[in-house]
């Protein structure tokens, strides 16, 4: 794993992936942090299970989608995105397909995108 350096703006230098563009400054807004975590928990309640892990780095992660339980190591189905992307999906401002096409959502595993069946969470 590459080592990351935190820059003056709070962003991790050399980081890759959807969350790396966001930086740690997002924690300066407690409303954003609360919204992201609340909506992640809401996702886990609406589609309970352990088959897919939805990650919003620096904010939280939940396991959801019924199916085979995952107990150790990296789950076979993982989705990762920034806080802004997660909020846009949860609020119905964009689709999973849009976020994937624009590289703001990373997904691995054959069932990774099954979490999208309950989106948007807020109607």
Placement of each model-derived feature along the sequence:
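Feature captures hydrophobic
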Residues: 1-123
